[in-house]
């Protein structure tokens, strides 16, 4: 039986052997692995890019105080970004499942059309959900736009839901029962040992104790600072500005979880973040162009 961490190790090794640069998680709160600059920003411009990484993802509204067996406000994704998207991307994915001990000839694996959109990033793509014996475990996306800019060449994204894959492989129905690791003395460290307390306390904060007034001020401050950086002409500050956009995005998600934003206000906030994302995307492409798109081998 593969432990949670062994699944990660195997995916890292598999994609490294396929030519991907295995990088580390982004050190900020994001709602999905897509928001890591290694996918979102690298999808822009003509430079090739092949990377794989684990990304902790936060969705405050999905917290359930640690009581729900398969719904979390903090979880893990394994992200693969392939640009340009190879013609055999689905075959590569199926090979990665074989590496985990999942034989496509034995199991019911279906690709279900499901196009993707992230309104706050001004991003969308054509894609599929991958269902393994009736459970969604992966999302495929061919990026079409980020920040309103066309992606040329198209980046192919594969996003594995690590918890769901692990629950299937280990045959458990409660995420907290997953075996994360085995210790040298033979003891088992479970997912619950690692994260149950975090789910309880973060859910309590997200829904009951977060300060809506303070969060609103934070959102406005992040937005103002991002605009200030984007207005600088004598230096490229696309990456610091993008981090401020992500901070604004997470703050918005906390406000949403707290119930502090009305339906009408929600659309307005999303529009404000999207406007920043578009400006960042433009600045990022300009900065790479000034560098001569260095990843394009002459």
UniProtKB/Swiss-Prot annotation:
Location within or outside the cell: Cytoplasm
A single GO BP: glycyl-tRNA aminoacylation
Pfam family, one: tRNA-synt_2e
Catalytic activity: tRNA(Gly) + glycine + ATP = glycyl-tRNA(Gly) + AMP + diphosphate
Domain of life: Bacteria
SUPFAM superfamilies assigned to the protein according to its UniProt record, in alphabetical order: Class II aaRS and biotin synthetases
Transmembrane portions of the chain: none
GO cellular component: cytosol
Top-level EC class as recorded in UniProt: ligase
The protein's Enzyme Commission number: 6.1.1.14
Disulfide bridge positions per record: none
Principal subcellular localization: cytoplasm
Subunit and partners: Tetramer of two alpha and two beta subunits.
Protein name: Glycine--tRNA ligase alpha subunit
Taxonomic lineage from the root: Bacteria, Pseudomonadati, Pseudomonadota, Betaproteobacteria, Neisseriales
């Amino acid at each position: 039986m593969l432990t949670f961490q062994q699944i990660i190790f195997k995916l890292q090794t598999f994609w490294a052997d396929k030519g991907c640069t295995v990088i580390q998680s982004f050190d900020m709160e994001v709602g999905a692995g897509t928001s890591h600059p290694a996918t979102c920003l690298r999808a822009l411009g003509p430079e090739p890019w092949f990377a794989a990484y684990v990304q902790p993802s936060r969705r405050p509204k999905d917290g359930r105080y640690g009581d729900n067996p398969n719904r979390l406000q903090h979880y893990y994704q394994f992200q693969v970004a392939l640009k340009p998207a190879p013609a055999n991307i689905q075959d590569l994915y199926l090979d990665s499942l074989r590496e985990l001990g999942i034989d496509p000839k034995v199991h019911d694996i279906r690709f279900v059309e499901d196009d993707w959109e992230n309104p706050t990033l001004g991003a969308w793509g054509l894609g599929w959900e991958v269902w393994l014996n009736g459970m969604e475990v992966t999302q495929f996306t061919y990026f079409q736009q980020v920040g309103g800019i066309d992606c040329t060449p198209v980046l192919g994204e594969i996003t594995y839901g690590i918890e769901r894959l692990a629950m299937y492989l280990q045959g458990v129905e409660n995420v907290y029962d997953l075996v994360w690791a085995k210790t040298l003395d033979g003891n088992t460290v479970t997912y619950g040992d690692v994260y149950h307390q975090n789910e309880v306390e973060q859910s309590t904060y997200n829904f009951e104790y977060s300060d809506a007034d303070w969060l609103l001020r934070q959102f406005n401050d992040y937005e103002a600072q991002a605009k200030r950086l984007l207005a600088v002409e004598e230096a490229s500050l696309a990456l610091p500005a993008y981090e401020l956009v992500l901070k604004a995005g997470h703050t918005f998600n906390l406000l949403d979880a707290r119930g502090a934003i009305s339906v009408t206000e929600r659309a307005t906030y999303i529009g404000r973040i999207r406007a920043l994302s578009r400006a960042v995307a433009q600045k990022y492409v300009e900065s790479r162009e000034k560098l001569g798109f260095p990843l394009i081998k002459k």
